[in-house]
Amino acid sequence: MAENSTHSPREATPPAFCNKIVNKGQLKSLVHWAFTHYGTARTAEMADHLKDLGFRYATKAGVSISVDDLQVPPSKRRLLETAEEEIRVTEDRYTRGEITEVERFQKVIDTWNGTSEELKDEVVKNFKSNNPLNSVYMMAFSGARGNLSQVRQLVGMRGLMADPQGEIIDLPIKTNFREGLTVTEYIISSYGARKGLVDTALRTADSGYLTRRLVDVSQDVIIRELDCGTQRGIPVQSMTDGDRVLIPLANRLLGRVVLQEVVHPETGEVILPKNEAVSESIAKEIAKAGVEEVVVRSPLTCEAARSVCQHCYGWSLAHAHLVDTGEAVGIIAAQSIGEPGTQLTMRTFHTGGVFTGEVARQIRAPFNGKIKFPKKMRSRPFRTRHGEDALTAEVSTSLTLEGDDQTETFEITQNSTLLVKDGQAVKMGQMLAEVAAAGRNVRKTTEKATKDVASDLAGEVQFSNLVPEEKHDRQGNTTRIAPRGGLIWVLSGEVYNLPPGAEPTVKNDDYIEGEDVLAETKLVTEHGGVVRLPVQEEGKGGREVEIITASVLLDQAKVWLESLQGRDQYVIEAQKKQRFLLKAAPGTKVINGQVVAELIDDHYRTKTGGILKYAGVEVTKKGKAKQGYEVTQGGTLLWIAEESHEVNKDISLLLVEDGQYVEAGTEVVKDIFCQSNGVVEVTQKNDILREVLVKPGDLHLVDDPEAVKGKDQSLLNPGEELLPGLSTDELRYIECVTTPEGEAVLLRPVTEFPVPDQPSVPSQESINEAGRAICLKAVQRLPYKDGERVKSVEGVDLLRTQLVLEIDTDAPQIAADIEILPDEKDEEVSRLQLVILETLVIRRDVSADQTQGSTKTRLLVEEGQQIDPGAVVARTEIKAKQGGKVRGIRSGNEATRRILLMTDDDLITIETQGKATSASEGELLRAGDEVAAGVTVAESCQVIKVQDGQVTLRIARPYLVSPGAVLQIDDQDLVQRGDNLALLVFERTKTGDIIQGLPRIEELLEARKPKEMCTLAQRSGTCQVIYNDDDSIEVKIVEQDGTITDYPIGPGQNPIVLDGQTVEAGEAVTDGPLNPHDILEIYFRFHRETKGVYESALLSLQKVQNFLVNGVQSVYQSQGIDIADKHIEVVVRQMTSKVRIDDGGDTTMLPGELIDLYQVEQVNAAMSITGGAPAEYTPVLLGITKASLNTDSFISAASFQETTRVLTEAAIQGKSDWLRGLKENVIIGRLIPAGTGFNSYDDGGLGEPDPSFEGMPFTDDDDVIDDRTARNYNINDVKPFSGERPAYDPSKPGEQQRSMLGIDPAAVGDDTLIDDQVAEKLNANLEGDQ
C-alpha cells in the first residue's frame, strides 16, 4: 500500500486484495486506509455502501437471536463436577484442621475462577467447532454487539459475585441466563447490578467534569508556529507492564516527528532522517529493524511560547498530515482524554481478601511423565496460599519433564513456586509450577488483612500445640497472639449461658438428669421494709415486688382536684384552713430537697413593682436564682412601691416630663395611664423611650438641697424630722429628685410585711426504717434579694412558703414516689403519701433455647410482710434440657458465666470388631484417622473411653490458626456456636493500584498526593535495612560522600530494598504509590548540585511529565482504550509549565509568584546581558484545576471557578487580558483565534512587548478601541501605499505594521488603546485603499 498521502485520488493505489473474514478490526483498517488515501467524502460514501451491504446480507441470512441459539456447552456439567469435587476435598482438609479459614476461602475462589475461565474457553470452542454461523457467536466475535464476558453469562456460568462491601461471596452463580438463576443466585446478582447502575450514573457526571477541567486547562494551546527549532525531545519505547507489551513502539511512533535520525541497529542505514514524521509503513519498518528507543519531538519539550509548534505536535491524527497552524490542539487533547472517561470503571471491585495481584503464569504438563530436578537446584519448602506444601526456587533453574517418547524443559525464574517433587509422576494438564514475574518492578505491595474464625459448634476449647503469647501495645491493651500458630480444638457439649449473679448448684463431673437444677439466682432486698405486691396487668412481662423502706403520710390534710388557672391541679387543705398547691404530680418521683407543694396565700402580694429591703430577715448565702433565697430567721420585709411601664417606643409619644409630679389616672405616654400619684422618671436611649417609672409619695420642694443630700435613699421613721417643719407619721423612704420646678425631696410610702421564724407545717405520720428518715419540711423562700428593684405592673409575691422533701440518708440519689391514697376510715377523703420504694423485678420464666436452659422463679414473700435488709425475695432456678455430665465450672474466685453438659448427643461409640485399639484416652483424632486397624472415624473427635471391642468418642472440631493470629479465647474456655475463636492476620497483595479508572486519572491530573505514598531516596547510595525486635524496620542510606540519611517508615509500609542494595536518587525505598511532587523536588535538588537552575528545572520536570503520561496511559490501557500520547502530553505540558520564584534577584518578579518557565528564562537571559542578578526559582507541578486558575487570561480563569476571587485579584493587580485563548474570545464575542480565525489576529499588535522592548517610549492615553475596528487590524488586508510592500521584518512586527498603516510607529505602542474617532479614520483609510 502506498503510504504517501500527496497522491491525488486518481493515482491512489487500489486496495490490495484481502482474503480475510471482515470483522470489526478489519473494517477499521479498511476505513482508515480509505480515509488516508481518498479523503473524507469518498470514505463516507464507501462506509455507506458497506452499511447497505451488511444489512442486505443480514436480512437475507435472517440473523436474529432465538432461545435455541444460546447453546450451553455439553462439557459444562463435567467441569462443574470437577470443581465441586476439588472444593469438597478442600472443605475436608479444612474440617481436619489442615488449612486455615483464609486458605480455604482462597482455594474456593481460585477454583471457581479457574472453572469459570475454562468454561468460557469451552463456550468459544463449542461455537467454533459445532456452529460457527450461530448468531450469538457471530455478533460477539465480529464486534457488532456484545462481548465475550456477556456471552459467557448467557451460556457459560455467571461466576463469582461480590457483596456490597466488595468482598467476594464464596458461593458462585453456577447457572447462566439460558438455564435460569435460582432465587439465591438472583439475590446475589442484584448487588452487582445495583452497583453497575449507580456506577454508571456517577461516572457520567465525573467524566463530564473531568472533560470540563481539561478543556479549561488546555484551551489556549493552538498551533501558532511551524518550527520552534528545539534541540530537546523525549525518548519513546514500547509501553510494557512486566512481560506484557501494552502499546508497541510502532503505535507510539505513528505521527510523531523524530528529533534525531533513526538508524537501523544492524546495517547502520538511516531509516528516517531527522525532523521527518513517522508514517505507518516507516513505523512498521522501525519496529521490524528492532530499534528499541526513538527520540522524538514532543509538546512536552516544545519551546514555542504559549503554544506548540507544528513539528513538535506531529501529525493531526484525523488526517495523517502534519497538523495545520491555527489548529486548536488543546481542545482536541482535552476531549480525547475526557471522552473515554465514561467507559472507565469507577472502582474495580476491591476483591475482599482475594489475592488477585498479578496472576502468576502457570506451567502445566503437556503430557504424562516424570519430573526431574537439576542436580544443584536450591529450593526451600514453602506453604502456598491454598495451604499446600510446595518449594520455592531460590535461584533461577529449570525443570525437566520426561515422557515415554518426548522430554521438555521449563525455565523457572527465581522465587517461583514448584508444586511437584523430584521424581514425581505427573498427568497431562497437571500444574507443575507458578512462575514469578521477572524484572525489577516486581514489588508487590502487600497490606495486612484479617479474617475471623468462628466456632461451628458449642463446647469446650482445648489448645493443641498452640502456645499463646501476650503482647502489650502502647495504650496498655493486652492482645494474646499465637506466634507459631497451631490448632484450636472445640470439644462438643451443651453450653448454658448463666444469667448474671447465678451460682451453680452442681460440681464438675456430677451426672445429672434432664430438668435438674443447674444453677440459681437469688433476688435480695438491699434496704428491707414492708412488701407490697402490685396488681399484675394482664400480658405484661416480668412481675415486680415493691418494698417500702420509708414513708410519710399527711394524716390530717385532705387532697382534691380543683381547676386553677385553667388547668386541673391538686389542692391540699391542712388544719387552720391552710391550702397548698401540689407541685409534683402523683406517680412521679421527687428527690431530696425538691419542692412538693406550695402555700396558696396572698398576704405577701404587692399591687405594683417596687424596691424590696430586708429588716431583720436573714437568708441562706447560696440562693439559686430559680428557687429563691431560703429564710433562716424571720423579721420584716419593707416594700417601697413604684409603677414601672416598659415602653420601647419613640420619644415623641411621651406626654409628661422627667421629674414631673402626676395625679393618678394621668396619661403619661400615649395609651398608658398611671395608677397612683407620684413623680415620673423617664429612661431613654437614642430617642427611644425605654421605660417610665411612677414613684408614689409626697413631693416637697427644698431650698437647700445640700441639707437633705446625706439622707438620700434612707428610711424616715414616724415622728422623725427631715427638715425643720417636715416630719411624717408613718415610715417613709427618702429620695431626692429634680423636678421642672427645682430640687425637691420625695417621701415614698413603705409597706411592711412581717415574716415568721418558722412557718406552720401540716401534721404528718411516718414509718421509717433504720437510717431512712423521711419528712416534709416547710421552707420560706424569698425570690428577690435585699435592695433589688422589681419591675412589674401587676404586682408580685414577695414570699413563698413551700413544702420540701427531706430524706435523711447517706444515699443522695434515692427518690420518693408521690401517691394519693383514699383514707382508711373515710373513702371519700384522699390523703397524700410519700414513699421510698425499692423495686425488684422478678424474671419471667423462659423456656429453654439454644444457649440456655429453662428458668423457673419462686416468690418467697407475701403482701404486707416486714422483711430485713438482705432477705431473699425470690429464687430463679436454671434447669438442664437433658441429662449429662457437668464440665467447665471454673474453680477459684472468678464467677462462672457458663456451664457445659456433656450429653449423649455429643458422644459416638465405635465398634472395633475385635481389632486392637490404637487410640489412647484423651487423644484427639482428626476425621479419617484410625482408631483401630482399618477402623476410621468419620469426624474429628476426642477419645473418652477405650473398652473391649468399642471406643467412646466425643465429637470435636479442629481449627488451624496461622502464625501471628490474635486469639479471642483461652484454653479450657466454653464457647457457644458462632463465637469468634481467633482473628487470622494475613497479607494480601494490594489490588492493582489503590484505585483504577476515573478516580486514578483524576488523582494524576490533579497532581494529588496519594495516601500512604512511598518514600523516595533523596540521593544515591547503599541501603542498610535493620529489622528491630519490636517489628519496626529502619532504612538508612549511606551516600557516596559517607553521609547517612535515615528514612522513617510509616506503619503499614514495607521496605522494598534489600540490605546492601545500591539505589539511585528518586528510587522508591518503600512500597506504595509515587507522589509526583516528590519526584519533581528530589530530581530538582539532585540536578541542582551539578547543573544550572534552568537545566535542572527542565530535567526534573521531564521526569514528572514522563511519570504522568505513563500513569494516565496505563489506566486507559488497563480498560483497553487507546489514546495517543500527544494528547496527554499537551495537558501535562500545561501542568508543568510554571515555576515558583524564590528570589526575584534584580528582576521585577516577586517571591512566591507563579510564572512560566520560559518567561523567567527570557528575563534571566536579559539580566545576564545587563549584569543583574537573575531570579532563583523552583519548578512546580500544578493540578489541572490549579493550572486553569493560574492562566495568563483572567477572563478564562474567572469563567472556570471562583469567579469573584479571580476577578478581584485581577482588578487589584491591574491585569490585562491579551485574549490569546479560545475561551476569552468566545466570552467577549470575538472571532476565535483558531482555524480560519487564526490569521485574523496574526501577530499584529498582539504579542507582548519583548523584554528588550523596555526602553521604547510609550504614549498611553487610556483610549479605547472597539471590536469592529480592532478586527480590521490586519497586515494582509492592507494595500501598500507605494508600489512595493516593505518586506515583513519579524523582529519588529508591531512597528512595521503600524508604519504600513500610516501611523507613526514611535507614537503608538503595542499596548496603546486607540479611541473611536481615530479608529474610524483608520477604517476609512483602509476602505479608501481598497
Curated annotation (Swiss-Prot):
Its cofactor is Zn(2+). Keywords: DNA-directed RNA polymerase, Metal-binding, Nucleotidyltransferase, Transcription, Transferase, Zinc. Residues 1275-1301 are annotated as: Disordered. It comes from the Bacteria. GO terms for molecular function: DNA binding; DNA-directed RNA polymerase activity; zinc ion binding. GO terms for cellular component: DNA-directed RNA polymerase complex. Binds 1 Zn(2+) ion per subunit. It catalyses: RNA(n) + a ribonucleoside 5'-triphosphate = RNA(n+1) + diphosphate. One of its GO terms (biological process) is DNA-templated transcription. The keyword Disulfide bond does not apply. InterPro entries: DNA-dir_RpoC2_beta_pp, DNA-dir_RpoC_beta_prime, RNA_pol_Rpb1_3, RNA_pol_Rpb1_3_sf, RNA_pol_Rpb1_4, RNA_pol_Rpb1_5, Rpb1_funnel_sf. Zn(2+) binds at C228, C302, C309, C312. The keyword Heme does not apply. It holds the Pfam family RNA_pol_Rpb1_5. It is an enzyme of class 2 (transferase). Its EC number is 2.7.7.6. In cyanobacteria the RNAP catalytic core is composed of 2 alpha, 1 beta, 1 beta', 1 gamma and 1 omega subunit. When a sigma factor is associated with the core the holoenzyme is formed, which can initiate transcription. Belongs to the RNA polymerase beta' chain family. RpoC2 subfamily. DNA-dependent RNA polymerase catalyzes the transcription of DNA into RNA using the four ribonucleoside triphosphates as substrates. This is DNA-directed RNA polymerase subunit beta'. The gene is rpoC2.
